Amino acid sequence: MYTAKERSFDKPCGNFGDWEIFNKIVEVSDQAREIVRVITQEHDLPFSIVGPFVPDNPVAKSLPPFAFKNSTKAGTMDLLMNAGPLHDEIARLARENNFAVVGSSANRSLTGSKFVFEDIEAQVRDVADITIDYGLVPYHNDKGLGSSIIDLVSYETIRVGCVYDQICDIIKDGFDIDLKAITAAKG
């Protein structure tokens, strides 16, 4: 996958998650936990978070060494939640079977997300063990943006995603945290 995507090993992959996996595996403040709940449950938005995790959780322990190394960084992991019905079902199955599922977008790195199967580069499709033509995916956009990724400890924006402005507004209005100002200050 890394070769086909031309992806750096310095860039960790994301883990499939849902509210229950998040609560069992990610160690963050009560405020950060409430932010995730509000965004994913009250506003029904996709959200990727980065936060410290419990390494001896059965889901985390299910990762083989290579996958563990490439889906965690400095004691943190990226967990994608609420990314549509197919994603949510895979996350549910992962949780019920205590089996982590690690993923990366179906595109060459840094070329933008692909929203229909036909747009995925052949070099990426050709290395997949299974492919699913899901039709036009939720949250498709002209900029090729995937999910927003927010560090739940520093509240720094790691990646601006398709519903970033909505997420910023929700967090600023409900929690008085200005993600854009925090990220700008970190330069």
Give the ranges of each region predicted by the language model.
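Active-site-adjacent structural elements in enzyme catalytic cores
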Residues: 1-187
